[in-house]
Amino acid sequence: MRPHCLPVFLFCMSLYTATVYSQIPFYTDDADTTPKRQFHLEMYNEHDVLQKSAYPVKRQNTLVFTLNYGLTKNLELGVNAPFITLINSRIVESGAVGGQGDMQFGMKYKLRAERDGSKLPAFAIVFYAEAPTGSTRKELGSGLTDYWLYGIAQKSLTKRTTARVNGGVLFSGNSSTGLIGIRTERGHVYTGNASLVRSFSNKLNLGAEVFGAVTSNFILDRGQLTGQIGAQYALTNKVTLTFGVLGGRFNASPRAGVHLGFSYN
């Protein structure tokens, strides 16, 4: 598509009735799975200002491609590939280094759908394995194979408001993506996420979340705690734009960041 045709294409597509269908920008996973024999694509860019402990690296840019496929009605397969750029202080000769990060391969199984009249939430379970495809010399990868298992609970509080909670454990490896996340080689890492998202129309969702991680020895200043405010806007029934602003505490979290992405069904 020619560059000058893109704005016209997006405008025309936005004239159609659209409904939001996207997880990003939120890190809190949902209990839904991709419909059987269909693909779901997500791509986003997150630019973060790092904690002072990461110096001389000052900022990190992470471009992530995620592709999901509905194998059955309740089973989804996924692959996640990040491209990471680390921006250094001026005291470092190489101003920036970049390359592929560690790739993730996962599956999600929906155990229970939410039902009208029931107080029980929807439940799903997710397993991810992360391959050490990123360069450890450039600090783009952990050099470890990660195994992560977590559960999802999702409940509609009203017709327009949905709460989601995730909780899990990394049995091996660590939670780092580039210089963000817990970088440990031994012991377990416990993770937790919670989000509240409200639908203001068929096109617009707004929400907030908090997510974090801590090692098995519970040293908080080496942990991760991040909050995010995000939005999802459906251009069409297939294309959703996403935006988020986030900030965090402790060494494993970014000080501040901004997210911009889209999803396609």
Please provide the spans of the model-predicted regions.
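Bacterial N-terminal signal peptides that target proteins for export
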Residues: 1-9
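Gram-negative bacterial Sec-dependent N-terminal signal peptides
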Residues: 10-14
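Transmembrane beta-barrel domains of Gram-negative outer membranes and organellar outer membranes
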Residues: 21-265
